[in-house]
C-alpha cells in the first residue's frame, strides 16, 4: 500500500553546489516551528532541503504527489516519516492510523504528541511538494499539528505556492523561516561556481553575471544552458530552454492485476457505477444501480477488504479509498463510457432526494444536463447562497449559455448577488442592467418584487461605496416593493437602513433597525446577515458608551459563529477586530493581541490588503508596551498596504492612529507633518470613524505645536460628538483636549478636563486613551487624585492609571530596541567585547528582559518563542559578552545603560 520511495530523502547530491548563504539562514532552524521553501518549479527547493538536512541524523522525508489528498493516506505517510525522524517514538499512533481507530486527525495528533514526550532530540519531518495537497481537512489538521507539536520538532515544507498552514500568523510571531525564490535564485558567485563545475573552459565573472541577469538566477534554466553548451557546442549565452514537467505514475496496472480481475463481471460493473460518487449510502447506490441488495453488497465488499470504508459516525455511509476510487473512475470511463452521462444524471437526482443540492449540481454539470442544472439552481440556489457555497454557484451560473440564463430572472438576480457578496461592487449595476435588457428581449416581465430585490442589492452596494443617502433611498424603496415572502432582500434592506442611520450618527434609529435585522436573519437562517447585524449593534453600543453591553453582545456573535460553523468567514475577523479594540481600550493588551493574531489567521487566504486592521492593532499594542522595534515592523507593513490599496476612511483612520502614535513615540515630527499635509478632512464627524480621523488630525497638530489649529479642530470634533450623542468619542476627545491644555501650560483647565473624562470612564472603561498620553498627563492625574472633589471611584481610577503609566514607562526603559543598540555599539566608550562580538537583535532583547527580572519562562512568553530557544539565546549572549551567570548579565546590562545615560 505504501510506497517506500515516498519516504526516502533524495540522493545524488554530489553534483549540487554548496550554498552557504542559504545554509547560514537555516542555522537557527531548530528553534522555529516551520521552515518553508517556497518558489516556482525549478528553483531547487527539494535539492536545497536535502542538502541542508544531509548531515542531520533525525530526519523523516515524505514526498507528496497529487494522490495524497485523502486524509487517511496523508496521515499514514506523515506518521511513517515522523517515526523515522524520532526513532519510532510514535509507533502506537501509527497503528491507530493504519487501523482507522481515530475519531479525527486532531485526536490522532494529540496521541502523537503524547508519545513524543519522551523523545528530546532535535528532529525534522519534511513535506516535499506540499502544493499538491488541496484537501482543506489536511490543511486544518496540519495547522493544529504546527500549533501544538513539541519544541524539538521542526516541520520543513517545500511548495510552489504559499501553503494554507497559518503562515501569516507564524511569520508575524517569528516562528517560521521562509526561503523564497529570491534566496533560491543563484547569485553571481554561485553562478560562477555552478558553470565552472560543469563547463571545461570555465566562465568569467562578467559572463556569469550576464547569464544570471538573463535568467534571473533560475537554477533549472542554468542547468539547461549548461547541457546545451555541452552537447551542442554552443556558447553559454546562446542556450536558453524551457523545462518540461513530468507526471506522477499511477498504480492502475497493479490494481487491475491484483484486485479487479479477480472479481466477477457483475461486481466489477457495480463498482464502476458506484464510483461516480465520492461517498454513498444504500439509497444513493440503489438510485444508480437499481439493485435492491445495495446495502448488503456494499457491506460484503467492505468485509472482503475491497478498499471500501464506512464513514466514522455516519450510519450506512461509505467511501472508496482515494486511490481505488480514482482507479475505478478510470476503468469506468474506459469500459462503459456510454453510461457516463446517465450515471451522473441519476446521481444528481439521488443527491437531491438526500437534500444535498451542492452534490447534485456537481453531478448535473458532469452529465451536461443544463436543464437539470437550471432546475437545481432555481429551487436551491438561494439556500446554497445562504450557506456560503458561492464558488459552486458562480461556476454553475457562468457555465450556462445566455438563453438559459436570461430565461430565468431568479438566476440573473442570484448572479448579481454573487458579485456583491464577493466585493465586486462595480459589476453589480452592469449585471442588473444587462439582465433587464435581456429579459425584455425575451418578453419576460420583471415584477415589482424583482425590482425590490434589485433595489435592496443596489442599496447595499451604495453603502459599501460610502453613499449613505443614496443607500437609504434605495433601501426604503425596496422595502415598499417587497412582500414578506422575499425575506433575504427585506433583511438586507432593513440592514442597510440601520447601517445608514449608524453612519449618519442617528444611533437611536440605527440600533432598533439592526436588532430587527438580527431577529429576521435568525428566523430565516441567514446567519451571515445575523452576524453582520450583531457587529453593527456592537459598534453602535460602543459609540453610545455602553461598552460592557457591546462586549456581551460580541459574546453572542462568537456563539453564533461556533453554532453555525462560520469560523472561516471574513466577518469572524471583523468580530475579533472590534473585540480587540475594546480590549485595547481596557488595557487588556495580551487578549487584544491574541484577537489580532486570530484575525490574521482567518484572513490568511484572502488578499493581504485585508490585513490592515490586524497590523494596526498589533502596532498599537507594541507601542503601548514600549516595543518600538517590534512596532516598527508592523508600521512598515501598514505603510506598504496603504500604498498598495485604496481603503474606506474607517480603515485608514485606524491605521493612521497607529502611525501617529509611533511617530509620537519616536519624535518623528517630519513624518507627522507629511501625513497632515495629505490627511482627509471629512465634512462631518457624526460617527466613530470620522471622529477618529479628526482626532488623528488634532493629535498631529498638538505634536507639531500647532495649538490653534488643534483647538479649532477639537471644537468641531466635540460639537459633532455631542450633537450625535457619541458618548465614547466625547470621552476620548476630553483626554486629547486635556493634553492640549497641558501643552499650553493651562494646568487647571487640563485637570478639569481630565476630571470630566474620568467620570465618563466609569461608564465606558476607556483607559487606553489615557495611557497613550501618559507622559503628558501622568503628573496631572497625580495632582488630581490628591484633590477632594474627585469621587472615590474616580480617585481609584486615577491611581490605577498612574500605576499603569509608571509600569509602561518602566517597560519602555528596559527594552533594548534597534535605535538604542545602534547608539550603544557606536559609543566611543563601549567595551571592545561588545563591538567585536555583536549580539543579535533578539539577544539584546533577552539581555534587557534579564535585567528587568524576567525568568526564562517569562522571557519565552514575552517573546512568544520556545523555552529551548531562550536558553540558546542566553548561552550565545553569555559567550559573546564573557558572562558566567545571570547576576553578571544584570550588572553588564546596568553598566551599559549607565554608559548611555539611563
Swiss-Prot record:
Gene Ontology process terms (BP): positive regulation of carbohydrate metabolic process; positive regulation of DNA-templated transcription
Residues of the HTH luxR-type domain: 832-897
Similarity remark: Belongs to the MalT family.
Protein origin, superkingdom: Bacteria
Coiled coil, from the record: none
Binding of ATP, residues: 39-46
Gene it is expressed from: malT
Annotated InterPro entries: P-loop_NTPase (IPR027417), Sig_transdc_resp-reg_C-effctor (IPR016032), TPR-like_helical_dom_sf (IPR011990), TPR_MalT (IPR041617), Tscrpt_reg_HTH_MalT (IPR023768), Tscrpt_reg_LuxR_C (IPR000792), WH-like_DNA-bd_sf (IPR036388)
Keywords associated with the record: Activator, ATP-binding, Carbohydrate metabolism, DNA-binding, Nucleotide-binding, Transcription, Transcription regulation
Function: Positively regulates the transcription of the maltose regulon whose gene products are responsible for uptake and catabolism of malto-oligosaccharides. Specifically binds to the promoter region of its target genes, recognizing a short DNA motif called the MalT box.
Annotated NCBIfam families: PRK04841.1 (NF003420)
Residues in the DNA-binding region annotation: 856-875
Organism field: Vibrio parahaemolyticus serotype O3:K6 (strain RIMD 2210633)
Name this protein carries in UniProt: HTH-type transcriptional regulator MalT
Alphabetized Pfam families for the sequence: GerE, TPR_MalT
Subunit structure: Monomer in solution. Oligomerizes to an active state in the presence of the positive effectors ATP and maltotriose.
A GO term, aspect molecular function: ATP binding
Free-text activity regulation comment from the record: Activated by ATP and maltotriose, which are both required for DNA binding.
Amino acid at each position: 500500500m505504501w510506497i517506500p520511495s515516498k519516504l526516502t530523502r533524495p540522493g545524488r547530491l554530489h553534483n549540487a553546489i554548496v550554498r552557504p548563504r542559504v545554509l547560514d539562514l537555516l542555522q537557527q532552524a531548530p528553534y522555529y516551528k516551520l521552515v518553508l521553501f517556497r518558489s516556482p518549479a525549478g528553483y531547487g527547493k527539494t535539492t536545497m532541503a536535502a542538502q541542508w538536512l544531509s548531515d542531520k541524523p533525525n530526519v523523516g522525508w515524505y514526498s507528496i504527489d497529487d494522490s495524497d489528498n485523502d486524509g487517511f493516506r496523508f496521515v499514514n505517510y506523515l506518521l511513517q516519516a515522523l517515526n523515522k525522524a524520532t526513532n519510532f517514538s510514535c509507533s502506537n499512533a501509527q497503528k491507530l492510523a493504519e487501523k482507522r481507530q481515530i475519531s479525527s486527525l486532531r485526536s490522532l495528533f494529540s496521541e502523537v504528541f503524547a508519545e513524543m514526550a519522551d523523545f528530546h532530540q532535535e528532529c525534522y519531518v519534511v513535506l516535499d511538494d506540499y502544493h499538491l495537497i488541496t484537501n482543506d481537512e489536511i490543511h486544518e489538521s496540519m495547522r493544529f499539528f504546527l500549533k501544538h507539536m513539541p519544541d524539538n520538532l521542526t516541520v520543513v515544507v517545500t511548495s510552489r505556492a504559499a501553503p494554507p498552514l497559518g503562515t501569516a500568523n507564524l511569520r508575524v510571531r517569528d516562528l517560521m523561516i521562509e526561503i523564497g525564490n529570491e534566496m533560491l535564485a543563484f547569485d553571481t558567485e554561485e553562478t560562477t561556481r555552478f558553470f565552472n563545475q560543469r563547463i571545461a573552459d570555465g566562465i568569467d565573472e562578467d559572463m556569469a553575471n550576464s547569464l544570471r541577469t538573463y535568467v534571473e538566477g533560475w537554477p533549472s534554466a542554468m542547468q539547461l544552458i549548461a547541457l546545451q553548451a555541452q552537447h551542442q557546442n554552443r556558447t553559454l549565452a546562446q542556450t536558453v530552454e524551457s523545462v518540461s514537467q513530468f507526471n506522477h505514475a499511477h498504480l492502475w496496472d497493479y490494481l487491475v492485476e491484483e484486485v479487479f480481475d479477480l472479481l466477477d463481471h457483475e461486481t466489477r460493473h457495480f463498482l464502476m457505477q458506484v464510483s461516480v460518487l465520492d461517498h454513498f449510502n444504500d439509497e444513493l447506490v440503489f438510485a444508480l444501480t437499481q439493485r435492491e441488495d445495495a446495502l448488503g453488497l456494499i457491506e460484503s465488499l467492505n468485509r472482503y477488504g475491497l478498499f471500501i470504508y464506512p464513514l466514522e459516525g455516519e450510519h450506512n455511509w461509505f467511501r472508496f479509498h482515494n486511490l481505488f476510487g480514482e482507479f475505478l473512475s478510470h476503468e469506468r470511463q474506459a469500459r462503459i463510457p456510454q453510461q457516463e452521462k446517465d450515471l451522473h444524471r441519476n446521481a444528481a437526482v439521488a443527491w437531491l432526494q438526500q437534500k444535498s443540492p451542492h452534490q447534485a449540481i456537481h453531478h448535473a454539470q458532469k452529465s451536461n444536463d443544463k436543464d437539470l442544472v437550471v432546475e437545481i439552481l432555481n429551487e436551491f440556489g438561494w439556500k446554497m447562497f445562504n450557506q456560503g457555497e458561492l464558488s459552486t454557484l458562480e461556476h454553475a451560473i457562468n457555465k450556462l449559455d445566455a438563453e438559459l440564463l436570461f430565461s430565468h430572472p431568479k438566476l440573473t438576480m442570484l448572479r448579481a448577488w454573487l458579485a456583491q457578496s464577493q466585493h465586486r461592487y462595480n459589476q453589480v449595476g452592469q449585471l442588473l442592467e444587462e439582465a433587464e435588457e435581456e429579459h425584455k428581449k425575451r418578453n419576460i416581465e420583471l415584477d415589482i418584487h424583482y425590482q425590490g430585490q434589485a433595489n435592496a442589492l443596489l442599496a447595499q452596494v451604495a453603502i459599501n461605496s460610502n453613499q449613505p443617502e443614496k443607500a437609504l433611498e434605495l433601501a426604503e424603496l425596496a422595502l415598499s416593493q417587497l412582500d414578506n415572502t422575499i425575506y433575504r432582500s427585506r433583511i438586507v434592506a432593513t440592514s442597510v437602513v440601520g447601517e445608514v442611520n449608524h453612519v449618519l450618527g442617528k444611533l437611536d434609529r440605527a440600533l432598533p433597525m439592526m436588532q430587527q435585522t438580527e431577529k429576521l436573519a435568525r428566523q430565516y437562517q441567514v446567519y451571515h446577515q445575523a452576524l453582520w447585524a450583531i457587529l453593527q449593534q456592537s459598534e453602535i453600543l460602543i459609540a453610545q458608551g455602553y461598552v460592557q453591553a457591546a462586549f456581551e453582545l460580541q459574546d453572542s456573535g462568537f456563539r453564533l459563529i461556533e453554532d453555525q460553523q462560520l469560523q472561516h468567514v471574513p466577518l469572524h475577523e471583523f468580530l475579533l477586530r472590534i473585540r480587540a479594540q475594546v480590549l485595547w481600550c481596557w488595557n487588556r493588551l495580551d487578549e487584544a493581541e491574541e484577537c489580532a493574531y486570530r484575525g490574521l489567521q482567518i484572513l490568511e487566504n484572502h488578499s493581504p490588503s485585508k490585513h490592515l486592521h490586524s497590523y494596526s492593532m498589533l502596532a498599537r499594542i507594541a507601542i503601548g508596551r514600549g516595543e518600538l522595534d517590534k512596532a516598527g515592523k508592523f508600521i512598515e507593513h501598514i505603510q506598504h498596504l496603504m500604498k498598495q490599496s485604496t481603503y474606506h476612511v474607517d480603515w485608514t483612520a485606524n491605521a493612521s492612529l497607529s502611525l501617529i502614535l509611533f511617530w509620537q513615540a519616536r519624535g518623528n515630527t517630519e513624518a507627522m507633518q507629511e501625513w497632515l499635509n495629505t490627511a482627509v478632512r471629512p465634512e462631518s464627524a457624526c460617527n466613530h470613524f470620522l471622529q477618529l480621523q479628526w482626532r488623528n488630525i488634532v493629535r498631529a497638530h498638538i505634536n507639531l505645536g500647532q495649538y490653534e489649529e488643534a483647538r479649532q479642530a477639537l471644537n468641531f470634533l466635540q460639537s459633532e460628538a455631542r450633537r450625535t450623542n457619541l458618548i465614547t468619542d466625547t470621552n476620548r476627545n476630553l483626554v486629547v483636549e486635556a493634553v492640549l491644555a497641558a501643552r499650553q501650560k493651562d494646568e487647571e483647565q487640563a485637570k478639569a478636563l481630565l476630571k470630566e473624562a474620568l467620570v465618563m470612564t466609569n461608564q465606558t472603561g476607556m483607559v487606553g486613551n489615557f495611557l497613550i498620553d501618559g507622559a503628558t498627563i501622568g503628573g496631572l492625574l497625580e495632582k488630581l487624585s490628591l484633590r477632594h472633589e474627585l469621587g472615590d471611584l474616580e480617585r481609584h481610577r486615577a491611581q490605577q492609571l498612574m500605576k499603569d503609566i509608571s509600569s509602561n514607562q518602566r517597560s519602555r526603559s528596559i527594552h533594548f530596541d534597534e535605535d538604542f543598540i545602534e547608539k550603544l555599539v557606536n559609543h566611543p566608550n563601549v567595551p571592545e567585547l561588545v563591538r567585536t562580538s555583536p549580539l543579535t537583535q533578539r539577544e539584546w532583547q533577552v539581555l534587557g528582559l534579564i535585567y528587568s527580572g524576567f525568568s526564562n519562562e517569562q522571557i519565552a512568553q514575552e517573546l512568544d518563542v520556545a523555552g529551548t530557544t531562550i536558553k540558546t539565546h542566553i548561552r550565545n549572549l553569555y559567550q559573546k559578552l564573557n558572562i558566567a551567570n545571570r547576576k553578571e548579565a544584570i550588572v553588564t546590562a546596568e553598566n551599559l545603560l549607565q554608559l548611555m545615560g539611563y
